[in-house]
Amino acid sequence: MDDYTREMMDLKTLVTRTLEKKGVLAKIRAELRASVFEAIEEEDRVIENNEGLPPALLGSCNDRARQLHASPSGRLLSALICEYLDWAQLNHTLKVYQPECNSAKDSWKSEIRDFSINNGYELNRNEDSRPLLLDVLEGFLKFENMTQVMGGSSRRESETESSLSLDTRNPPRRSSASDSLPHQRRSVSASQASGAATSGYRKDESNWRYDTEDMPEEVMRASTALENLQLDRKTRNLTSSWRNVKDGTSEEEEGKD
């Protein structure tokens, strides 16, 4: 390879990189692709009109996409995409997209006009205009966020109400009657009743009276009744013991006589 050929190769590489970096080659490729599609589309129309055969290029997407594009939602979807391509001035891409979607040229404009009138969107185009697809997407996202926020707040309110209702139905119990009552001896013999049980009872009684400040009224009544019952039993035990002692003394005096 001589010097001239080497210099031309370097120049070609430099020009190609520069055009690629500035997007000129991408635009040329898109324009060439669009021109090829337009030529094939015109040929398809001639074949379809003259021979009634299905076109070779129109509707080249899959079956699911064709069914979607035939529905009202699919037509609106294609129209929003075409409106965005037109807004971004991707004209060559738009020329390729429409034939592949089996949609007529500029048919998306009527769809966009009807959608804008029904939903209150403005179609005035200026430097600060935004694509309609972006407005629809942002509106959907705002609605989803509002739904989640409202759902979360309502869920928290329902949980709060349920917890309050549970607290109302089941109030906290400070203590039960069995826990609040003083620890008394279950069985007391007659001999023990007159002895050490008296001091123990007084100690339990003082402890019980100290704890009655925090007792409910019903527990206090039950405790008072139990206290009276125990006092009555102790009185009867002491009385019987005193009578036994007195009877024994009388018998001894009679024996002496």
From Swiss-Prot:
Keyword line: Cytoplasm, Cytoskeleton
Disruption phenotype: Extreme defects in morphogenesis, positioning of mitotic planes and cellular organization due to dysfunction of the cortical cytoskeleton and absence of the preprophase band of microtubules. In the ton1 insertional mutant, the two highly similar genes in tandem, TON1A and TON1B are simultaneously disrupted.
Compartment list: Cytoplasm; Cytoplasm, Cytoskeleton
Subunit and partners: Interacts with CEN1, LNG1/TRM2 and LNG2/TRM1 (via C-terminus).
GO BP terms in the entry: cortical cytoskeleton organization; microtubule cytoskeleton organization; preprophase band assembly
The protein's role, per its UniProt record: Involved in the control of the dynamic organization of the cortical cytoskeleton. May play a role in the organization of microtubule arrays at the centrosome through interaction with centrin 1 (CEN1).
PROSITE patterns per UniProt: LISH
Ranges of biased composition (kind: Basic and acidic residues): 201-212, 244-257
Region (Disordered): 148-216, 231-257
Primary location group: cytoplasm
Taxonomic superkingdom: Eukaryota
Domain LisH as annotated: residue spans: 73-105
Disulfide bridge map: none
Keyword Cytoplasm: yes
InterPro entries listed in its UniProt record: LisH
Species: Arabidopsis thaliana (Mouse-ear cress)
Composition bias, Low complexity: 187-199
Identification of the protein by name: Protein TONNEAU 1b
Cellular component per GO, a single term: cytoplasm
This protein's record includes keyword Cytoplasm: yes
